[in-house]
Structures are given as C-alpha cells and as structure tokens.
Design a protein with these regions (language model features):
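Phosphate-interacting basic helix/loop segments used at nucleotide- and nucleic-acid interfaces
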Residues: 30-45, 142-162
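Short, conserved active-site loops that position catalytic residues or coordinate cofactors/metal ions
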Residues: 50-51, 55-58, 63
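N-terminal glycine-/serine-/threonine-rich phosphate-binding loop
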Residues: 10-52
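A structural signal for small-residue-enriched, beta-sheet-centric alpha/beta enzyme cores
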Residues: 13-24, 57, 67-73, 78-139, ...
Length: 261
C-alpha cells in the first residue's frame, strides 16, 4: 500500500525548523515561490535543496483568489433558519454549506462538515481571520495537492528542490486544542510504512504506518502563526521519501475502514 521510495537526505547534522518572516501581504496572483525565497534570503535563511516547505493554506487560498465577500452571498432558507437559531451570520453559514459535501455532526452552534476534498473539519475550513478585509472569508484551496505541486515546480524553477506541504489548523475528535495537519503535498510520500520491518526484538510490524505529512505540518506550526504573521515554516535535515506523484489521498481513511463514520 505504501511502497518504499528513495530518500532525500539533506547534508545537515540534526533537524532544523525555522519560520520565514517578512512575507508581504498575500493577494490574488502573488508569486508565492518568489515571495518565500526572497523573504527567506532577506532573513538570512536561504532555502536549500532537500528542505521541506510547509505553507499555511490561507496564503495559498489568497494567492489563488479563493476568497469571497459576505456582501456577495445570498443565504439559503436553511442557512437563515439555522443562523437565527444559533445567532450566527447566515452568509457565513451559507458559504460553509456550499463548501461541504455533507454535514457530519451538528451540536448547538457547531457544524462539523466533510468538505468536497474529503476533509472532516469545523465549518468546512472557512475562516475570517487574516482574510485581508472585514467581511471577507477565506476558503480552502480548491485542490491543495495541485497547489503544492505548482509551488514545488515554481521553487524548482528558482533552483530549489524542496518538498511542499500545504497545512491547515484542524480540531481533533477526542482531544482539546487544535493542531496543524497536511491537506496537500508534493514531492514526498505522506506516509512512512513500517509494515514488513522488524523491531529490535524481532517482532514484525503488521499495521504500523506513520503519517509524516501531519507530523511535519505540526512541527512547522511551532515556528508559524497568524498573530506573528509567519505563514511559512521550513524543515531542514529530515530524510524524506521522494515521490513526484504524491497526493494527500493515502492519508484520508476510506469510509469502509472508518469505525466512527
């Protein structure tokens, strides 16, 4: 299911994680690759081959024009009725519903939805924070994998061979607090399988598979943040599995294997 692939081993001793400060305000058609490279270089943190570049989905969406003005939204009858019950903005709820494949759970004012990508999250990933203007919503990228591939290709055109992860902040069903996870990936396989390998005592792993993409997204969040205006993190010194056809699809559990769906 998860084939072993060749690895990119960066010639650095130890693992380094750093944020990229100084990025400009991202607007539609901003050249993200050029902006990231310029900001990193200006900060004395020039990108290098083998880096893993973790980019907050919000700036990807803004660069791709995935924003919507609330004034342009006409709420449906359901959105109006639901919003009146829970004191919510009906235009926001309408956008949440449009971005959803289905409502997974509804409890009080909380909507947990499955997006058209297959992600299960609050409010379809729709967000007002750091949108760039009052009354504007930022949506998830239409195809985060395609976004990651474009950014990886654009970085390669600038002479940098890096893997790219598009991240977003999600809640977790059984734990308090949010964490960043990967919603798009390019250049590296998202999962490291230990199936068929053996532990130090000779026991064979039958099901062990680690979601590296989520772990790396979470690690990069330690140096990123909305308040600090650092939407890009770089991980250096990690040996990653090269896969130019990688997508986030292997991370999404099929309904037939999901005990809680």
């Amino acid at each position: 299911m998860w084939p072993v692939r060749r690895c990119y081993v960066h010639p650095v001793s130890g693992l380094q994680i750093f944020g990229v400060p100084g990025l400009p305000e991202i607007v539609e058609d901003t050249d993200l690759a050029a902006s990231i490279v310029a900001a990193a270089t200006e900060a004395g943190l020039a990108l290098a081959d083998g880096d893993i570049v973790v980019v907050t989905s919000k700036i990807v969406s803004k660069a791709e024009g995935r924003t919507i003005e609330l004034a342009d939204v006409e709420p449906s009858a359901f959105a109006i009725e639901w919003s009146a019950t829970w004191d919510k903005d009906p235009s926001v709820i309408e956008v949440v519903l449009r971005e959803a494949r289905r409502i997974v759970r509804q409890s009080g004012p909380v909507l947990i939805t499955e997006t058209h990508h297959g992600f299960v999250c609050a409010n379809s990933g729709v967000d007002q924070s750091s949108s760039g203007a009052h009354g504007r919503l930022v949506l998830l990228p239409t195809d985060p994998d395609a976004s990651a591939r474009r950014l990886r290709a654009d970085l390669a055109a600038l002479g940098i061979d890096a893997a790219v992860i598009i991240s977003d902040t999600f809640g977790r069903a059984w734990r308090e607090g949010q964490t960043d996870i990967a919603i798009g990936i390019a250049g590296m396989h998202p999962i490291r399988s230990y199936i068929g390998e053996f532990d130090p005592h000779g026991h064979e792993f039958k099901v062990q598979a680690v979601c590296l993409a989520d772990e790396l997204a979470g690690a990069a969040e330690l140096v990123k943040g909305n308040i600090s205006r650092v939407p890009v993190g770089v991980i250096r010194g990690y040996a990653w599995e090269i896969d130019d056809t990688a997508t986030i699809a292997p991370v999404l559990r099929e309904p037939s294997r999901d005990l809680f769906r």
